[in-house]
């Protein structure tokens, strides 16, 4: 009982702290924020100044909500072009959650859609209006290659453990790694370590390869 009371008091304290901060607009989200989500948000926005962060909460602790909070923040700061790369099966789920929880419109893109109106999509991605693209890992790389003059402001990679073998795995991971260099990003995964520490090395390298250096280190 005491533990629950302390948790409630801490939660109220963190909410009051948020209300008095420059991030008060986040309280408009249609969700009840937990203290660990607010802490993750505050840590992440600081980490974005140096490249980004890997959010590795366990399943069910709300990594998607944390990502939505961070996305709201970067949009508030003026980000225009956002790319959300994930398994194809999660595209619709992300589109719905961004709208239902944060009132953020997003667009699911795939190859047939872009091929049909390539010049129109190029225009939409290069003008000064906000656009949030949800797409698969594979097509995210193809999209970035196709429109190389598009300057992405922010990238979210969900289920990022699928890309852990960036230096000795599939071209999918390597391509996204190379194309996303220098772009602020967050990686979401519940399993940052699946086999060995090299898994973590691969994920961290998406943020900054200098942190761990080579795999041998």
Summary of predicted features, one role per range:
Residues 50-70, 160:
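Walker A/P-loop
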Residues 44, 58, 70-74, 94, ...:
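Hydrophobic residues on the short alpha-helix immediately C-terminal to a glycine-rich phosphate/catalytic loop
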Residues 52-56, 83, 186:
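Short hydrophobic/aromatic beta-strand immediately N-terminal to the Walker A/P-loop
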Residues 151-153, 199-202:
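A short beta-strand element within the Helicase C-terminal
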Residues 47:
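Phosphate/ATP-binding catalytic cores across multiple sugar-kinase/actin-like superfamilies
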Residues 183-196:
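Conserved helicase ATPase motor motifs in RecA-like P-loop NTPase domains
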Residues 200-213:
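A short helix-turn-beta junction within AAA+ P-loop NTPase domains corresponding to the substrate/partner-engaging
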Residues 2-42, 63-66, 75-172, 181-182, ...:
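SF2 helicase/translocase NTPase motor core
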């Amino acid at each position: 009982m005491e533990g629950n009371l302390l948790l409630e008091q801490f939660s109220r304290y963190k909410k009051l702290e948020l209300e008095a901060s420059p991030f008060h607009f986040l309280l408009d989200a249609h969700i009840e924020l937990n203290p660990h989500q607010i802490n993750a948000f505050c840590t992440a926005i600081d980490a974005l100044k140096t490249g980004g962060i890997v959010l590795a909460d366990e399943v069910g602790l709300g990594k998607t909500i944390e990502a939505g909070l961070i996305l709201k923040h970067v949009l508030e700061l003026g980000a225009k072009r956002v790319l959300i790369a994930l398994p194809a099966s999660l595209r619709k789920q992300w589109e719905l959650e961004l709208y239902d929880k944060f009132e953020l419109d997003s667009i699911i893109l795939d190859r047939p859609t872009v091929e049909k109106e390539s010049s129109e999509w190029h225009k939409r991605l290069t003008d000064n209006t906000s656009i949030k693209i949800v797409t698969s890992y594979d097509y995210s790389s193809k999209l970035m290659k196709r429109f190389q003059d598009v300057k992405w402001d922010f990238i979210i990679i969900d289920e990022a453990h699928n890309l852990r073998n960036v230096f000795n795995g599939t071209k999918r991971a390597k391509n996204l790694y190379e194309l996303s260099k220098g772009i602020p990003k967050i990686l979401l995964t519940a399993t940052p370590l699946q086999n060995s520490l090299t898994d973590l090395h691969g994920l961290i390298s998406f943020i900054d390869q200098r942190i761990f250096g080579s795999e041998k280190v």
